[in-house]
C-alpha cells in the first residue's frame, strides 16, 4: 500500500518494510525511525525485521539521503541480553553497528532527548515511565517516582546514505 500526498511541494509516501515498491527506490530524501527500532530488534531472529528495515531504508533513499533515529537508549554498561529491545531499550553502539552494516555513515547526534534520570537496568521496562506508567497505575507512590523520572532517556542520531 502506497500513498502520495502533496503539500507545499512535498510528497509523502508510505509502505511496509519488506514490501516497498521498487518505484520508491532512490526517491526519498529522508527516512525516520521514531521509537520503533526496539520492536524490530526484538524480532530480528524470528524474521530479520531490523535487517529488512535497514535494507529498505537504504534502497528508498537517494544518494546522500538521511536517516533520523530517536530511540530509547540503554546505557552501554547494561547487559546486551537486557538491551535487546524486549524492554524497549537499545544501546547506541548496537544502532551504530547495525546502520554501518547496512551501509550508512554516522553524521551526528544530539542530546535533546537525553534524560539522565532514566537509569534503567535489568528488570526495568521503558513502559514503566510516562506516558504509559505500566505497573504503577494503582500504586500512587511508585507512579509519583516514575513521573519524577519523566520520559525515557533517548538517543537522537543522524545517518546518511553515501553519495554515489
Q: Language-model segments: what does each one mean?
A:
Residues 21-32:
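A short acidic, Gly/Pro-enriched loop at the edge of an enzyme's catalytic core
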Residues 1-12:
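Single conserved hydrophobic/aromatic residue that forms the stacking wall/gate
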Residues 47-63:
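A short glycine-rich, Lys/Arg-flanked "PGG" loop and its adjoining helix->strand segment in the class I
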Residues 110-132:
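Conserved catalytic loop of SAM-dependent methyltransferase domains
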Residues 41, 65-90:
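Conserved class I S-adenosyl-L-methionine
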Residues 34-37:
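Residues lining the SAM
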Residues 88-109:
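Short alpha-helix
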Residues 102, 141-164:
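C-terminal lobe and adjacent flexible extensions of AdoMet/dcAdoMet transferase-like proteins
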